[in-house]
Amino acid sequence: MSSYMEAAAAARAAEAKTEGLLRGACALLAAAAALLVGLNTQTETVLFIRKKATVKDVQALWVLAMAAAAAAGYHLLQLLRCFYLSRFADGKPCRHRRAIAWLCFLLDKGCAYITFATTVAAAQACVVALYGTHALQWTKLCNIYTRFCEQVAGSLVCAMLAAVGTALLSVVSARNLFRLYPSMLSPPPSSFVG
C-alpha cells in the first residue's frame, strides 16, 4: 500500500511541475506580448509633419497590453501557488480544497477567454491598419509605420500562444477540480467466480 501512496505522491509532484512549466511559459509569453505592444512607438514624417504612432492610438492594442499584463501577473501568482504545493504541501489534506479548485478553474477560464478575446480584437484592428478600409476612406498605416506594425504582429503571436497555453491550463484546472468529486458510476458487479 505504501508503494501506491509513494507513486501517487510522485505523480502529483510531476503534475505540479508540468503545470508550473506551462504557467511559467504562459507568464513569459503574456509579459512579452504586453511589453512588445505597450512599449512600441515609431515616429515618421508624413507630408512635412512628424507623426508618432503609439499603442494608445488604437484602443484595441491598449486593451491587449493591459490584458496581457494582467494575465502575466495572474500566471505568476498561480506559478507561486504551484511552487508552494509542490514543495510544502506534501499531500496534506486541506479543508478548502474544493473551493480553491473551483476558484482556480473559474479564474483560468476567465483568463483564457479575456486573453483570447483581446488578442482577436487587436488582430482585427491590425488587419484594418494593414489593408485599410476603402468604404470608410481609412488608409493603410503599415506601409508608413512598418516597424511599429512588425512589433505589433510579434506581440499578437506571443499573445495568441499565451491564450492557447491558458486554454490548456484551464483544462488542467478542470481535471484538478473534477478529480475531487467521486465518480457517479457504480462499480462493476464482482460476481465473477474464478
Swiss-Prot record:
One of its GO terms (cellular component) is plasma membrane. It is found in: Cell membrane. Keywords: Cell membrane, Membrane, Transmembrane, Transmembrane helix. It is a multi-pass membrane protein. Belongs to the Casparian strip membrane proteins (CASP) family. Homodimer and heterodimers. This is CASP-like protein 2C1. It comes from Oryza sativa subsp. japonica. The lineage of its organism: Eukaryota, Viridiplantae, Streptophyta, Embryophyta, Tracheophyta.
